């Protein structure tokens, strides 16, 4: 996202159907371009805009279940034939409501142990990120084409290279070698993908970090802003009130996720604490995720109550 000069509030959509919004798979011949209820989504987006939201964080390729063609070696060979059509649809819906999109290219589930459902592999792609040849194929055949097509599109407010990579980085968020890659490999992916972006896009580039305590994983890799997440379980080691200047980052910070359910702090309190700490914005979790951290009505009430946005 192009960071505004003053504090802003955004929203994690984060998907309409996890892994199924962009590209074809066993469940649908396409993603959003063949969605059965576009009017419902349009109404939802208008509601977000009416509450002052200008940017939505949207997961694109997720765990690799759709949108990417893989070769016999398990490495990417390119985007499938409907991805661009689906992205065009997403951006069109957002534009009509006056929203911009922050695409999240990959989720950490990309690296989790593979599962097969209805003949579709979910996850199990960690070698793509751990091996130099896999990273090169991913960036050249999947990520670069997205940057080239949408890198100057004003409806795209930024690019998130991977969501919460710490959970699959050995020695950072996990010690399970079966579902992780080495720290140097993850840093290489982020560095190379950021360099690819800077050669092709005008929007800023970021990574959704699981916690501010792990920002060291992504520092010094060419990101344009840092995007730590905050949940109550991290409070003891990464307090929400910690001043941004104490984190010694060379770029601005945006609070990329915070819970709207199950937290000791109400959404409006989190937003004001983030503002006071020096963040440039905060994006609540979430609008449509069906999980214990999501309460969209609670978020709406907080915004309607007058959380100041500029």
Model-derived segments and spans:
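Short, well-ordered alpha-helix to beta-strand connector turns
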Residues: 223-224, 250
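Substrate-binding cleft of secreted/luminal carbohydrate-active enzymes
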Residues: 9, 57, 249-310
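Mature extracellular/periplasmic domains of secretome proteins
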Residues: 215-220, 241-247, 270-276
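His/Asp/Glu-enriched short active-site or ligand-binding loop at hydrolase and phosphoryl-transfer sites
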Residues: 229-234, 283-285
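Substrate-binding surface in catalytic domains of secreted glycosidases
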Residues: 234-242
